Amino acid sequence: MGRPKQLLSLGPKTVIRHCLDSIIGAGLKDIVVVLGGDDGAIAGAIDGLPVKTAENRDPGSEMAESVRLGLRQIDAASTAVLVCLSDHPLVSPETIRTIVAAYGGHPGGIIIPLYKGRRGHPTLFPRTVIEEVVSGRNLREVITGHSGDVLSIEVNDEGVVLDLDTPEEYERVKGRFI
């Protein structure tokens, strides 16, 4: 797409600002953004926001490595972690609050949002499984290994399944801001 997708514009804000505004707007604390690649520009785009950053010095590595780096920065007192992807900019604060509330009713569970039956993001992981990810398992392996602890919740938010992996997807999402 010519530049990091986190820096693409959606209306007056960048993709990364849309993501973080939803997370912050949902009332979450201890937010960690993992930077890699062209991060001077991304760091500038999030300057002033109440977030911590971690640097992935090998931005070509698997996504799991970025997740591990972020998880290592989370406060030890946190009971759960919401893993948000920076290419899902349309997830609403209300959806994030719904996911967190579902965890309150299913403590220890992995909470995955669905839109019309299709799994989406972000996913909430309990502290009890975070160490598995930090020690080397990827998120998919953790979800599979704890399938009995997964709670899938239907949400009325297409943003959980809309990502920006291709220029066509970006144009489709961008069209919502015109």
Residue ranges and their predicted role:
Residues G37-D38, D58, E62, E94, ...:
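Short beta->alpha linker loops
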Residues G48-S61:
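Conserved donor nucleotide-binding strand/loop of the catalytic core
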Residues K29-I31, A80, D149:
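Residues at the starts of beta-strands that form the adenosine-phosphate
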Residues G27, D47-P50, H146:
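Short, structured coil segments at secondary-structure junctions
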Residues G60-E132:
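Conserved beta-loop-beta/alpha segment of the NTase-like Rossmann-fold superfamily
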Residues E131, S135-I178:
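Conserved alpha/beta core of the MobA/IspD/sugar-nucleotide pyrophosphorylase nucleotidyltransferase superfamily
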Residues M1-L35, A43, I99:
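N-terminal glycine-rich phosphate-binding loop and ensuing alpha1 helix
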Residues G40-I46:
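Acidic helix N-cap motif at the loop->helix transition within catalytic regions
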